From Swiss-Prot:
Broad EC category: ligase
Name under which the protein is recorded: Cysteine--tRNA ligase
Gene3D superfamilies per the UniProt record, alphabetical: Cysteine-tRNA ligase, C-terminal anti-codon recognition domain, HUPs
EC number: 6.1.1.16
Keywords, comma-separated and alphabetical: Aminoacyl-tRNA synthetase, ATP-binding, Cytoplasm, Ligase, Metal-binding, Nucleotide-binding, Protein biosynthesis, Zinc
Source organism (scientific name): Malacoplasma penetrans (strain HF-2) (Mycoplasma penetrans)
Compartments it resides in: Cytoplasm
Length: 439
């Protein structure tokens, strides 16, 4: 399987040895509830993870938790609580969201930055030893002029790049593009290291964790398009400094989520928290909405678009339930000895095309209706199994089983009354089944 690499602008094999995949997706800074824009990358890479596992790859998936940051320090001060108490609370909230949106986590690890300070110290020291960094008044800065590879990820030249974070003291730095690996501070959470008392820079945390858990180069690095520069750029150049190679073979960037064609921001009062969205719409609707557009393109969030996605998916599930009802009535429903046909994944294995898999499912629903009309129950049973598997196991749609003993009894009674031509009574059962969305 090949996936498009946004740096080389070519399709690349997802695994060099055809067996193992190492994947890293930048996680949240846990100082607040995540917003709906944060859901798009993790849902996107959840589907990719599920796909790889289905194809038989051994996938190691790392998704970090940034629990050390100036934002956390400032928020904790506002709320008059400790930084770790604050970050722990929002970390728990984030994991609740992941559970709600049905993220497959059995092969994932979620390392916290605060648990890896010694690793970060050693990683920074390697960069210093290799003469890619310098110390100024207890701060450690990466010298971006030491490599002609800086700008490779964002496709920018050094003299075109923006200056570093506003929080950094540019007067201390040799070059305005240089960034902090370690920041000297006694304010907020800090550690006493050989450099100074302080805390790590954001860009160093991710590259260090990748090296610790996944080695000197990974197969896929993912995240939102907003992280391409400076975060991914700075991650990559550190790996070049330490390991003399790019951090990842494939870089995947998920497009922006706009709200009513505007960038989401608090100033525009269009900032929507994930927990608020999920209190109004279920997980299936939210996931299906994200599948409507190629993961790398911008996606426009509107209530109308969300409702359209909801209706589309509900129609698909409704039809699948109708097909199952008829299979049960005809005593043709049987999932035993059936195996998922991986040819159904062709739209996903073809450069991970999410909108095409949506179209594929809709076309198969139409074809299933033809099979039902023609009473080709054997083929209908196979297709029903494959579509249900694709929706639940690969696309992460939560299955709700409507076929309890009562429902099956209603179906059989309705069918028996029809055969007996007792139409007045059968219509009563038909109405009950329609209310349950089984007919």
């Amino acid at each position: 399987m090949k996936i498009y690499d946004f740096v080389s602008k070519t399709d690349k094999e997802v695994s060099l040895d055809k067996k193992n995949i190492k994947m890293y997706v930048c996680g949240p800074t846990v100082y607040n509830h995540v917003h709906i824009g944060n859901l798009r990358p993790i849902i996107t890479f959840d589907v990719l993870n599920r796909l790889f596992l289905e194809l038989g790859y051994n996938v190691t998936f790392i998704h970090n938790i940034t629990d050390i940051d100036d934002k956390i320090v400032n928020k904790a001060k506002e709320e008059n609580i400790g930084e770790l108490e604050l970050s722990s609370y929002y970390e728990t909230q984030y994991f609740d969201i992941l559970k709600t949106i049905n993220i497959h986590t059995s092969n994932m690890k979620f390392p916290r930055v605060s648990d890896h300070i010694k690793d970060i110290e050693n990683y920074i020291q390697k960069i210093v030893n290799n003469k890619f960094a310098y110390l100024v008044d207890g701060d450690v800065y990466f010298d971006t002029t030491k490599s002609n590879q800086y700008g490779k990820i964002s496709n920018k030249k050094l003299d075109e790049l923006l200056v570093g974070d506003k929080s950094e003291d540019n007067l201390k730095k040799n070059n305005p593009q240089d960034f902090a690996l370690w920041k000297q501070t006694t304010i907020g959470l800090n550690w006493d290291l050989k450099f100074s008392t302080g805390r790590p820079g954001w860009h160093t945390e991710c590259s260090c964790l990748i090296n610790k858990y996944l080695g000197d180069q990974i197969d896929i690095h993912g995240g939102g398009i907003d992280l391409k520069f400076p975060h991914h750029e700075n991650e990559n150049i550190q790996n070049i400094a330490v390991n003399n190679k790019d951090l990842a073979r494939i870089w995947m960037h998920v497009g922006h989520l706009n709200i009513n064609n505007q960038k989401m921001s608090k100033s525009l009062s269009n900032f929507i928290l994930a927990k608020d969205l999920l209190s109004e719409y279920n997980t299936n609707t939210v996931r299906w909405f994200f599948y409507q557009t190629s993961y790398s393109n911008p996606l426009n969030f509107t209530t109308e678009n969300l409702i359209n996605s909801k209706n589309q998916l509900e129609n698909i599930i409704y039809n699948l339930n109708i097909f199952k009802s008829h299979l049960i009535i005809e005593q043709k429903y049987n999932e035993k000895n059936l195996e998922f046909d991986k040819s159904n994944l062709i739209e996903l294995t073809n450069n991970f095309n999410l909108p095409n898999i949506v179209s594929f499912i809709e076309e198969k629903i139409k074809y299933s209706s033809i099979l039902l009309r023609n009473k080709n129950f054997e083929e209908l049973n196979k297709l029903h199994f494959n579509l249900s598997y694709l929706l639940t196991k690969i696309l992460g749609i939560i299955h709700v089983n409507l076929f309890d003993d009562e429902a099956i009894e209603l179906l059989n009674k309705w069918n028996k009354l029809k055969q007996e031509k007792n139409f007045s009574e059968s219509d009563k059962y038909r109405k009950l089944l329609m209310e349950k969305k089984l007919l």
